[in-house]
Amino acid sequence: MEEFKRYLELDRSQQHDFIYPLIFQEYIYALARGRVLNGSIFFENAGYDNKSSLLIVKRLITHLITQMYQQNHFLFYTNDFNPNKFLGCNTNLYYQMIFEGFAVVVEIPFYLRLVSFLEGKERVKSHNLRSLHSIFPFLEDKFSHLNSLLDILIPHPVHLEILVQTLRYWVKDPSSLHLLRFFLHEYPNWNSLMTPKKFSFYFSKRNQRFFFFLYNFHVCEYESIFVFLRNQSSHLCSISSEIFLERISFYKKIELEEVFTKNFKAFLWAFKDPFLHYVRYRGKSFLASKDXXLLMNKWKYYLVNFWECYFSIWSQPRRIHINQLSNNCVDFLGYLLSVRLKPSMVRSQMIENSFLIENASKQFDTLVPITLLIRYLSKAKFCNVLGHPMSKPVWAALSDSDIIERFGRIYRNLSHYHSGSLKKISLYRIKYILRLSCARTLARKHKSTVRSFLKRLGMGLLEEFFTEEEQVFYLTFPKASSTSGKLYQGRIWYLDIFCINDPANHE
């Protein structure tokens, strides 16, 4: 810890929460530039208490600084950037580098607070919690006992100045915040950042780390209203993953628990609920309760007022929905979630009489959104909007094995992700679309008919579309048809899925 602080020269500046001098340190931009080029995250290690090798880091910095000075900055132009040259330099490049460096600098105080907070405390270190599927066992265990659900879309900030204003409560360095405000206003195409769709696309493509920092900070401020519930409910579970800042903010919110409890003391009577669960992924969150819709209406009213008063955001009606889990399906992480009644009948035999007892239990159900998947395949030009398979002319120049392998990999990824559904029969339609699209692409390449290619390839084409479970079934029963692979119809949650792959992305 002390070596890391001395290396970053924070001993003197940390006393007054000044991070402004670090912006002028050259190695900060070398770290930021190297992290972007290598696609790695410097501060996000497997364990926070694991000391990195400073010798390796110093060698990396020296190499990156030398490489940066030797590179020609005019090669960094992009098509949609209009380079503004000042004294022969690309100013857009330096805007981007300062954004990347600022993201590194601002994370340093948060990182040091997290490390100091975790000193002497045991934490569960599990990479499995980063998997998207790790949240579904929790939903399966808890949501079957709940009735009402508040479906929330976290609103985007109407202006980035609001983010700067909220950031000043954490980073108490006016000079750094003024510099951030200056570059946000001077950044090219500033007006395009005001549109929510362009906001995420623009930053995620240009300055991914900086976008994550600003957006996660906005979400962290929004989630601060749930801190006071930790003392009121032992069932409140907060699952955060993937982003370094989210974990810092979660531990920091635990420290501020007493403060928020005092501030919200007058509202505890209205929101006290022993069966209240909160789950979020990116900009979508759920607040589920066992009580009737009265509590959900109170939460909806409170959230709308909180957004308007604290973030100056007018909440649109479509941002918050109150759903009954037994009557509605909710779209979350590529699944349709619902709670349905599962009827069961028990025969009771007494001495002389026997009678039937009808019983119904609640069951958490996960369905495959087949309409949404067909829409994705339609955008990727594998089929039309009705689900009729189409050829892929762009891939006609590839070899036959590459074409078959690409189609098979797309289906295996989709089947792998939706293995948690009990009704996997919906995936057979996706397999049909991709198989026929593959056959039509091959027929188009060789200027032949689809029937002749299916007859020529036979099982060779089918094997590429087998999942792991179907391969085991096929090897065990080689004479069985591939479409009858119903060896196991239960849910399978994989703990190695960290993102949802776009069907159009084939890399």
UniProtKB/Swiss-Prot annotation:
Q: Which domain of life is it from?
A: Eukaryota
**What role is this protein assigned?**
Usually encoded in the trnK tRNA gene intron. Probably assists in splicing its own and other chloroplast group II introns.
Alphabetical UniProt keywords: Chloroplast, mRNA processing, Plastid, RNA-binding, tRNA processing
An example of a Pfam family matching this protein is: MatK_N
Where does the UniProt annotation locate this protein?
Plastid, Chloroplast
Family label: Belongs to the intron maturase 2 family. MatK subfamily.
To which species is this protein native?
Lyonia lucida
User: Does this UniProt record's set of keywords contain DNA repair?
Assistant: no
Q: Does the keyword Membrane apply?
A: no
GO CC terms in record: chloroplast
Q: Name one GO molecular function term.
A: RNA binding
- Disulfide bonds listed in the record: none
Full protein name: Maturase K
Mention one GO biological process in which this protein takes part, according to its record. mRNA processing
Q: Where is the signal peptide?
A: none
Q: Which InterPro entries match?
A: Domain_X, Maturase_MatK, Maturase_MatK_N
